[in-house]
Amino acid sequence: MSDNYSLIIKNGSCYIDGKFQNVDLALSRNKIKKIGKIELNSNKVFDATGKTILPGVIDTQVHFREPGANNAENLESGSRAAVAGGVTSVFEMPNTNPPTSTFEEFNKKLEAAQNRMFCNYAFYFGATPNNMKELAAVDTLKAVSYTHLTLPTKA
């Protein structure tokens, strides 16, 4: 008895063991379950002949401009655009208005992201000359890291 898959990607070029190989991928519940030659057993089959299959891309420097310039882009629209381009994870920069350089602003951003992001996400904490105490404790936050802010800031 063969497995049922939600999607089979046929004849795609994947980089495996140091070289590109044409393989099939079987997915179930958005996870790769099998790589190799796969007999068709899915309602959805995508022919990837001549195409390269890549894992999701991680963008470590996005600027979604929320808060402050939500009319340009925000967490929801930016993450939707990322996913449309094959990006599965983003690290958002802290140069917003106000900047994400205090625990209060960082926690507001985490709260704003709940149920609005369409990909995996993390936020940088902004380092300024005026927030050294916060920087010393930044590892207690859910920040991916911290980065310096090169714009005028109060915090």
Name the predicted role of every residue range.
Residues 1-41:
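N-terminal metal-binding scaffold of metallo-dependent hydrolase/deaminase domains
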Residues 72-79, 131-140:
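Short, acidic/polar
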